[in-house]
């Protein structure tokens, strides 16, 4: 290792890395996913990198877990979370589709011209993810401006409540304030809207709730 190489922190094998995603203890190991662009040292169409550890100190990279492959996430797999149910690993994330690409750089869009859908994928072992067969869109892009923003609604956090599974999303209200959207599910696949929370003075979009 060189003096500038991390030895006890997760670092992408190369290129770009940002948000940690889907941290979970599953089948005897800690799993950490993270936003990455594996084609250059810059932001681009987001993928999910994947690393595992038995002690939270020594990490082994498992390559790319999620990559753009469906209409709902063709331009990026944004941040999200992970849960386990009946031995299966569930990953939830925001898929992005550009409505207007930057003609000078197709990894970017122009003027926030994109929409965001909420996606899920499952794995039986936490290592192999079939990005073609096992992805599905669970919440379509927001269609009612009073509810949220079709572009800036993202970063699903899923957890088990006393009576059901719950999800919270960060979004941007039509009043210019940040907003949280709450959803509920009995089976981790079919989600229904519950309510929203908003407050002025705390930013225009509440990312990564």
Locate predicted features:
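Beta-rich carbohydrate-recognition and catalytic domains
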Residues: 1-208
């Amino acid at each position: 290792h060189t003096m500038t190489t991390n030895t006890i922190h997760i670092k992408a094998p190369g290129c770009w890395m940002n948000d940690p995603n889907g941290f979970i203890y599953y089948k005897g190991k800690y799993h950490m996913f993270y936003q990455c662009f594996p084609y250059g040292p810059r932001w681009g169409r987001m993928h999910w990198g994947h690393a595992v550890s038995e002690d939270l100190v020594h990490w082994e990279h498992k390559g790319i877990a999620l990559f753009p492959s469906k209409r709902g996430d063709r331009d990026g797999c944004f941040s999200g979370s992970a849960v386990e149910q009946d031995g299966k690993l569930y990953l939830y994330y925001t898929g992005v589709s550009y409505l207007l690409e930057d003609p000078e750089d197709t990894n970017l869009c122009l003027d926030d011209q994109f929409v965001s859908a909420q996606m899920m994928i499952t794995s039986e072992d936490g290592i192999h993810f079939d990005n073609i067969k096992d992805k599905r869109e669970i919440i379509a892009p927001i269609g009612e401006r009073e509810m949220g923003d079709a572009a800036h609604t993202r970063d699903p956090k899923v957890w088990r409540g006393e009576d059901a599974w719950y999800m919270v999303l960060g979004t941007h209200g039509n009043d210019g304030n940040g907003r949280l959207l709450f959803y509920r599910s009995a089976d981790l696949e079919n989600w229904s809207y519950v309510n929203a929370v908003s407050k002025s003075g705390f930013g225009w979009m509440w990312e990564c709730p």
